[in-house]
Regions:
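Alpha-amylase-like alpha-glycosidases and glucanotransferases acting on alpha-linked glucans and related
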Residues: 1-73, 98-181
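Conserved, well-ordered alpha-helix/loop/beta-strand core segments that scaffold catalytic motifs
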Residues: 65, 70-98
């Protein structure tokens, strides 16, 4: 398969996330890397007219960010194959939480506990323990577990399945986030 064809195949096979991620990165760059909640209201709220405008305005940059993901995926796949052929398994982390300023939160705010302005109602952390006498404030938005339950936890299933394309063993970082929630 030619590189251009392989890139198109990658985009099709990863259409569920790569397009949104690439658009997010291009728009973020357009707004000088400020958090998406500081972008113009129309694109911050993903109004269709604004989405069309930025898809056209940032078309080349969107393709560039998708290509970067393709290049990483291709190189990582070759590395993983080499490691596996030599008896080495790759262990990878999947963080339980995503950053507030992320493609996930911008593309699907309904998955998180946000208010009407798409600001977090509460953020993640952990209480005092043996590692920290004062506890920790991580600042990540909390999930809307009712939404995830209604959707059969599909986002989680897809996320974890994708990790198993990248790693042989997946570690949830940190599991306490699930256990204590």
């Amino acid at each position: 398969e030619k590189p251009e064809e392989a890139f198109e195949t990658f985009k099709k096979e990863n259409s569920e996330w790569v397009g949104e991620y690439a658009l997010y990165m291009a728009v973020k760059n357009h707004f000088n890397s400020v958090s998406w909640n500081q972008w113009d209201e129309d694109i911050r709220n993903r109004e269709e007219k604004a989405m069309e405008h930025y898809r056209e305005l940032c078309r080349e940059e969107i393709d560039f960010y998708a290509w970067l993901q393709y290049e990483f995926y291709t190189q990582w796949g070759a590395l993983k194959d080499y490691a596996n052929q030599n008896g080495i398994q790759i262990i990878g982390d999947i963080p339980i939480y995503v950053a507030f300023d992320s493609a996930d939160t911008w593309a699907a705010p309904e998955m998180f506990q946000f208010d009407e302005k798409n600001e977090p109602k509460a953020v993640a952390g952990c209480p005092p323990d043996g590692f920290s006498a004062t506890g920790q404030l991580w600042g990540n938005p909390l999930y809307d577990w009712e939404y995830h339950k209604k959707t059969g936890y599909q986002w989680w299933i897809r996320r974890i399945e994708y990790c198993f394309k990248l790693y042989d063993i997946v570690r949830i970082d940190h599991f306490r986030g699930f256990d204590e929630y």
